[in-house]
């Protein structure tokens, strides 16, 4: 990458968006320097902001520095957690799982349908691949529309984006390990399928296992209705 590449990203003068820079989070040694949680509200049928704030509130409770960026489209957001040294993608994603699970348990009224994925999206680099690409913030064309910028918890953009970035706090690996010990949860999968997957492929359906169902259920019939 050259200076002009970053300048063009920030300037955003290409009408086709060909100057946008993205980043593959996972290094060759399967480590990363950040966890980015993507909340995407393409349909605009539900409020992604409440989902984002629930995630951020857990971060605040756990003393995890977290920063909100409004997406380039304006219909979603990224929640960024930065690490002061590279950590394994496995650990980073495990932290994201724990935060998201806690956020869900704190407010049962939230559907979290806007949750899309984590970046990195894998624990390890796929063989022969680079992982998933995340667009960097502060893209010029989107910024002129008030998007691709860091915002406060009222979703108002910070007046000075560079000053805000100069004051971010990063999570240490020692702090990360302690959080994982205190808040261990099972692995959480994707809650949302988007057009960015492979829409031309038939999704793989896992067969249901007998242990997924109770051995007995009680069925009550009344007024020609069935109640469980």
Segments predicted by a language model, with ranges:
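C-terminal accessory nucleic-acid interaction domains of nucleic acid-metabolism proteins
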Residues: 106-228
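Short, solvent-exposed polar/charged micro-motifs at secondary-structure junctions
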Residues: 78-80, 146-147
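Generic detector of bulky aromatic hydrophobic side chains
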Residues: 50, 101, 138-140
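Residue-identity detector for threonine
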Residues: 31, 37, 61, 85-88, ...
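Signature for HUH/AEP ssDNA processing cores
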Residues: 1-75, 82-94, 98, 105
């Amino acid at each position: 990458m050259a200076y002009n590449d970053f300048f063009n990203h920030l300037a955003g003068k290409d009408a086709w968006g060909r100057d946008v820079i993205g980043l593959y989070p996972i290094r060759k040694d399967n480590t990363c320097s950040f966890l980015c949680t993507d909340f995407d509200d393409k349909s605009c049928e539900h409020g992604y902001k409440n989902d984002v704030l629930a995630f951020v509130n857990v971060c605040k409770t756990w003393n995890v520095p977290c920063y909100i960026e409004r997406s380039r489209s304006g219909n979603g957001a990224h929640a960024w957690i930065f690490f002061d040294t590279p950590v394994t993608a496995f650990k980073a994603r495990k932290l994201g799982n724990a935060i998201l699970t806690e956020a869900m348990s704190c407010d049962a009224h939230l559907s979290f349908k806007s949750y899309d994925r984590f970046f990195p999206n894998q624990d390890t680099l796929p063989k022969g691949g680079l992982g998933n690409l995340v667009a960097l913030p502060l893209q010029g064309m989107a910024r002129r529309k008030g998007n691709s910028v860091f915002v406060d918890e009222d979703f108002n953009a910070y007046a000075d984006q560079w000053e805000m970035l100069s004051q971010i706090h990063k999570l240490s690996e020692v702090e990360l390990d302690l959080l994982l010990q205190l808040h261990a949860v099972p692995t959480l999968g994707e809650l949302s399928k988007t057009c960015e997957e492979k829409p031309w492929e038939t999704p793989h359906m896992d067969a249901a296992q007998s242990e997924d169902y109770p051995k007995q259920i009680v069925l009550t019939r009344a007024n020609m209705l069935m109640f469980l």
